């Protein structure tokens, strides 16, 4: 009777485990065979001729995505080329160069910090930093997500840019100044956090270049496609 009860109980347990997708393996506890292994997909690499690269001079207050449930301005309002996606981020409240492509591997190499694509920003800050302040940024500053890598930083005269809409909010009794900051990292809102860390909040941020590509000659809100020769040079730069 005891043996029969044990067999019945064991049978019920196996039936329960089978229904749940679990079978015991030798010497180990039950394993769940319903779990599927999802291999990490490699970014899609296209040939030179198949690749499209778009340079876009992003206006202020535009999201770097093509849809938005809240009805805010997106890339769809400016770019009519299908199946291209942004290489890296550019915050809604930032302006300037955004690169888009249909080549997944190119997108990955432009955005991933390990490929060290240098990005140049013109940054209007509140106040006038001294050389000792800039030296902190060059060396690296401690942010919540770690110490930043060394940056190239210098004071510049006010650049000849388009008017921002809406204009920045300036305090009349506090002067502003412009910095040129070059970094190869891509942390969230990194430049803004860097300038705030040394006591000079960012008022306006414009990305002017990524690697060899820049917004020179590109009006704010407009885009252009790279030529085949330009794409070839870009492939060589990122070692594709």
Swiss-Prot record:
Stored PROSITE patterns: PSI_RSU
Any one Pfam family match given in the protein's UniProt record, by short name: PseudoU_synth_2
Domain of life according to the entry: Bacteria
Top EC class of this enzyme: isomerase
PANTHER family assigned: PSEUDOURIDINE SYNTHASE FAMILY PROTEIN-RELATED (PTHR47683), RNA-BINDING S4 DOMAIN-CONTAINING PROTEIN (PTHR47683:SF2)
UniProt record similarity statement: Belongs to the pseudouridine synthase RsuA family.
Matching NCBIfam families: pseudouridine synthase
Name of the featured protein: Ribosomal large subunit pseudouridine synthase E
Annotated organism of origin: Haemophilus influenzae (strain ATCC 51907 / DSM 11121 / KW20 / Rd)
């Amino acid at each position: 009777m005891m043996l029969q009860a044990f067999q019945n109980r064991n049978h019920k347990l196996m039936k329960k485990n089978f229904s749940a997708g679990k079978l015991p393996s030798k010497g180990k506890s039950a394993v769940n065979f319903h779990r599927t292994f999802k291999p990490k997909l490699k970014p899609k690499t296209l040939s030179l001729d198949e690749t499209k690269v778009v340079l876009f001079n992003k206006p202020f207050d535009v999201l770097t995505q093509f849809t938005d449930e809240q009805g805010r301005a997106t890339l769809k309002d400016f770019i009519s080329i299908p199946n291209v996606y942004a290489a890296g981020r550019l915050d809604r409240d930032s302006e300037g160069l955004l690169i888009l492509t249909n080549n997944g591997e190119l997108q990955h190499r432009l955005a991933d910090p390990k490929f060290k694509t240098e990005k140049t920003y013109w940054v209007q800050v509140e106040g006038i930093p001294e050389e000792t302040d800039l030296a902190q940024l060059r060396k690296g500053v401690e942010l919540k997500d770690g110490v930043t890598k060394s940056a190239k930083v210098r004071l510049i005269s006010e650049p000849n840019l388009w008017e921002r809409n809406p204009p920045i909010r300036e305090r009349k009794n506090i002067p502003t100044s412009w910095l040129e900051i070059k970094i190869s990292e891509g942390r969230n809102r990194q430049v803004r956090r860097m300038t705030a860390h040394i006591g000079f909040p960012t008022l306006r941020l414009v990305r002017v270049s990524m690697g060899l590509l820049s917004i020179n000659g590109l009006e704010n809100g407009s885009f252009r496609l790279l030529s085949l020769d330009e794409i070839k040079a870009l492939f060589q730069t990122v070692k594709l």
